[in-house]
Swiss-Prot record:
Homodimer. Induction: By drought, cold, high salinity and abscisic acid (ABA) treatments. The lineage of its organism: Eukaryota, Viridiplantae, Streptophyta, Embryophyta, Tracheophyta. It comes from Oryza sativa subsp. japonica. Highly expressed in inflorescence, lowly expressed in root and embryos and almost absent in leaves. The gene is G6PGH1. This is 6-phosphogluconate dehydrogenase, decarboxylating 1. Keywords: Cytoplasm, Gluconate utilization, NADP, Oxidoreductase, Pentose shunt.
Length: 480
């Protein structure tokens, strides 16, 4: 006999927390995990956290049969083969019209393949991005479901209550679009997250290495920044990090953390997609490259011995001015990073015919997710003003903000260069802006070179058509 409204398979911390969130919102939920101890652990947590209606099952048949028809099962398992294995386990007991939702960070084409395979079996399928980490899953994530619209309608009432709630814009969930669009949008969200984190780390590096700010001063600076236009989850937690003392030694914990950044692959996927779509995303690419370089810890230690010396300019620094300049540089760079992410999504939407609403994406990212920020409200309004906006940089408000901040931005990048401090994200953002704002680039020389050695032809600025010049013959004749 059916006892629950929905099921969830995969009870690592994210799965457990999402199940408890669903139950807490008034929806009885069945839970299943291949390792049965996780089932018992989740049920016990439900009791401790308020006798929540969570029902555990140790075998897939009982689990599926406990859910009311048409059945909806969310999977939260590792991307790739584990997803296919879980689908096979569940599908053996599901009936026509039932629905499977993959809530993991899956490659969008895998979602489209699975949706097609499930459709052939009479099952519905959704790929749903879930952002917010463990805390978000428990208390309200940002949700990005894409795939079968019929499947979305099955679960819309649950998602609207489970998602993060933002007072001025509602639940942080919307139907993203067809196919693998939900997973694709979550992937790019993560790429933007890479950019955000890199830019913040560069702001920290300049303030510490050039401005000589202490951790206590950095905590105060980031706390103050979190009251203005940079107000965001990542700025907030950065301020928190600078306040934490090392409980296993002296000083602050942040200074004891190894400078080697991990990653799970979504940032790399984003950069690969940008390349496939011919979309410039240098800030996001720089953030990925920085993670690769951070992984070369042993090589960097040896290189530091080879390139010994003081690269600082030894010029006096006005600390207050530096803090303000870095704040402005961070904000301007952030605009460029988000512009690149949105352009990747727009290009993919056009290629796949998804008709994605970029303003709506900004809205559902305002709460619950890792990149949640007051800044996203500005992005939503920009796309509300012009849904066909070519680039966030040319929105009138953002354009004015960048113009107002570019002097500080340039000062920070130059100061970093002169002091041997790398700012790949800020530098890439500035180069992106400078390239995008110019009506003529030195690409004419590159195209001339291509025509010289490869007869790739070129276009002219003064007449239509495609042209080829015998550059070598002309140059050789001129030298004779």
């Amino acid at each position: 006999m059916a006892v629950t409204r929905i099921g969830l398979a995969g009870l690592a911390v994210m799965g457990q927390n999402l199940a408890l969130n669903i139950a807490e919102k008034g929806f009885p939920i069945s839970v299943y995990n291949r390792t049965t101890s996780k089932v018992d652990e989740t049920v016990q947590r439900a009791k401790v956290e308020g006798n929540l209606p969570v029902y555990g099952f140790h075998d897939p048949a009982s689990f599926v049969n406990s859910i009311q028809k048409p059945r909806v099962v969310i999977m939260l398992v590792k991307a790739g083969a584990p997803v296919d294995q879980t689908i096979a386990t569940l599908a053996a007991h599901l009936e026509q019209g039932d629905c499977i939702i993959d809530g993991g960070n899956e490659w969008y084409e895998n979602t489209e393949r699975r949706e097609k395979a499930m459709e052939e079996r009479g099952l519905l399928y959704l790929g749903m991005g879930v952002s917010g980490g463990e805390e978000g899953a428990r208390n309200g994530p940002s949700l990005m479901p894409g795939g079968s619209f019929e499947a979305y309608k099955y679960i819309e009432d649950i998602l609207l209550k489970v998602a993060a709630q933002v007072p001025d814009s509602g639940p942080c969930v919307t139907y993203i679009g067809k196919g693998g669009s939900g997973n694709f949008v979550k992937m790019v969200h993560n790429g933007i997250e890479y950019g955000d984190m890199q830019l913040i780390s560069e702001a920290y590096d300049v303030l510490k290495s050039v401005g000589k700010l202490t951790n206590s001063e950095l905590q105060q600076v980031f706390s103050e920044w979190n009251k203005g236009e940079l107000l965001s989850f990542l700025i907030e937690i950065t301020a928190d990090i600078f306040s934490i003392k090392d409980d296993q030694g002296s000083g602050h914990l942040v200074d004891k953390v190894l400078d080697k950044t991990g990653m799970k692959g979504t940032g790399k996927w984003t950069v690969q997609q940008a390349a496939e779509l011919s979309v410039a995303a240098p800030t996001i690419e720089a953030s990925l490259d920085s993670r690769f370089l951070s992984g070369l810890k042993d090589e960097r230690v040896e290189a530091a011995k080879v390139f010994q010396g003081d690269f600082s300019s030894n010029l006096p620094v006005d600390k207050a001015q530096l803090i303000e300049d870095v704040r402005q540089a961070l904000y301007a760079s952030k605009i460029c990073s988000y512009a690149q992410g949105m352009n990747i999504i727009k290009a993919k939407s056009m290629e796949k015919g998804w008709s994605l609403n970029l303003g709506e994406l900004a809205r559902i990212w305002k709460g619950g997710c890792i990149i949640r920020a007051i800044f996203l409200d500005r992005i939503k309004k920009a796309y509300d003003r012009n849904s066909d906006l070519a680039n966030l940089l040319v929105d009138p408000e953002f354009a004015q903000e960048i113009m107002d901040r570019q002097a500080a931005w340039r000062r920070v990048v130059c100061l970093a260069i002169n002091n041997g401090v790398s700012t790949p994200g800020m530098s890439a953002s500035l180069a992106y802006f400078d390239s995008y704002r110019r009506d003529r680039l030195p690409a004419n020389l590159v195209q001339a070179q291509r025509d010289y050695f490869g007869a790739h032809t070129y276009e002219r600025v003064d007449m239509p058509g495609s042209f080829h010049t015998e550059w070598f013959k002309i140059a050789r004749a001129a030298k004779m």
